[in-house]
Amino acid sequence: MSTYHHGELRPALLRAAAKILEKEGREAISLRDLARRAGVSHGAPYRHFADRQALLAALADEGFALLAQALEGKPWREQAVAYVRFGLANPQRFALMFTRPVPDPLRRLVEGDAVAQATWAMVHGLTHLILSGHFAGEEPEALVRRTLAEVRFAQRSA
């Protein structure tokens, strides 16, 4: 029995792949398994993705789009918190996203702005450190806000 509506196989495959990614990691994703789960022929996913790498690229692109939505319209401090929140909620996708080039819309947010680049680097690094357990016991959003406040204080004091 098929688990998708006609004409919606690509989004169904991406949803299933995203679930596998977060539960089992990217190594567990295969087009054949996704076809089986969707109840379609093993060749059907190839109408939407040339190969496994194309599927992973689509997952990463979708992740960047979701991240952009999470950041949109927020002041920079809230963007920093939203960035960390996104990474913590989607650790496997977050890691996958940064195995590829950052898309132009996100790259342009920091391009040519040294403070924005430094803030992104700091927040991205904090996200990875939190994910790897280096700030165990600390509330992530409070950590981000405190770190940003300390950096702003240091800038004013310099």
Ranges and model annotations:
Residues 103-151, 155-158:
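Hydrophobic/aromatic-rich alpha-helical bundle segments in the mid-to-C-terminal region
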Residues 13-21, 63, 67, 83:
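Short hydrophobic clusters on alpha-helical segments that form packing/core surfaces
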Residues 12, 16, 20-54, 58:
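Helix-turn-helix
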Residues 21, 55-63, 97-101:
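Alpha-helical DNA-contacting segments of helix-turn-helix folds
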Residues 77-100, 120:
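Helical hydrophobic small-molecule/effector-binding pocket
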